[in-house]
Amino acid sequence: GTVRCPDMESLSAALDTLYGANIDYTVRKKGERQCVGFAAGFIDDAFTPHGEKLLEPVSAMLGELLLDPVTHGGRFLSSYVESEKANLIDAIRGLKNDKRDWADIRLMQEMCAGEPYSVLRLGDEETAGRITNQSLYVHGQALMASSRVEVIYCGSAEAQRVEDAVLTALAALPRGAQTALPEVQRIQAPDTPRRIVETMDVTQGKLAMGYRCSSDDYPAMVLANLIFGGTSNSKLFLNVRERLSLCYYASSSYARSKNILTVSSGVETADFERAEAEIGRQLQAVQQGDWEDWEQEGALQAIRASLLSLSDSQGALE
């Protein structure tokens, strides 16, 4: 909450006066960067009953949440921090409940051990447990003072009006020397692949594989990933899943920031080695350019459709 709206009840009431505007926090992981902030949604001025302007008051509310939080003695309220800390720890522990996601998480933790990329979006339970109301407040102030700030707006308001509203709302933002972001670590693949097997009480095994790529040709890597395992017409789907029935699912993804290609699949334990070998054969086929024209055209169509659909979502435009 804020000094003016110290709890959820008063904060919700204030947002209700803005025709149901909503504000939520964001915690994102972009490569080796953690991006935190707030996102607000509100109706356009053209649709308010009496032509009310909402950009300015919503921006002001964002400024309050960021710069005028409710505190006591120069620190956040202990009860709020302990409650949110418990929620964070529960969320971290809950990651294991989705075994598919957990296999992918463990892949990155092992494959990128010692690199910032291995850190979870939500952090780890041990670090979360050490948070106090004072340490969190101090960290927040330092974060605002030294981090790069980006403001993204999607709507009908003129750019100058948006700039004025945001600058007014953030006028008290503490700013110091901006911390330089380190270069993203690019690690060479080891000579010998590593294999890690973990046992869990599940009915369906998960096979996650990761490859460090040497090419910096991003468009080519996107196309190759789609042909390999990025669509329902891909080699993994049509061969490993459909033709050979070695996996319940099999797909690939490409992380541009780290130049890493990953495979996620669900397999029966008895089919583990066959599935692993077949996935390797399909990847080798892509590396050698062994695909049909219809496979390439299908991948290109997927790229075009994805680009054309960007304007359908404000979140995607961001």
Residue ranges and their predicted role:
Residues 69-81:
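Short secondary-structure capping/junction motifs at helix and strand boundaries
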Residues 133-169:
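Non-catalytic, conformational "gating/processing" segments within enzyme and secreted inhibitor domains
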Residues 1, 141, 148, 167, ...:
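His/Glu-based metal-binding/catalytic segments typifying zinc-dependent metallopeptidases
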Residues 2, 46-51, 73-75, 93, ...:
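Second-shell loop/turn segments in exported
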Residues 58, 139, 162-165, 220, ...:
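Hydrophobic side chains in well-ordered alpha-helices
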Residues 8-64, 68, 100-123, 148-154, ...:
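M16 family metallopeptidases and their MPP-like homologs
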Residues 90-94, 190-206, 304-314:
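Short, low-order "capping/linker" segments at domain edges
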